[in-house]
């Protein structure tokens, strides 16, 4: 899958969750011309890279692009702690990723989720997520 620069403005807020989906997809997903992600609520490209790295996802990145090598069998064997950098879309995306793993995935700084999805935790729990807040 290739997401090109001309599509980025239309789907800028979906890039974090698309990156998660790409992590479990077969083959490579290329997202190019996405430099404006570095200037959203957080540096979203950096936050995506850091989170994917902690989950063991293979990827290559540059200043304005990321290529994610999907792995349908991706799993983690130990607890992982991911920083959302106060970005609600990063937090929701990596919480959703956590549903796919046998081990615990912890997200720091999730209080901003209410910004875009006030009932996220209720909805997420109804899908089987075991959520603990501190």
Give the role of each language-model region.
Residues 1-134:
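Short, structured segments at the rim of ligand-binding sites
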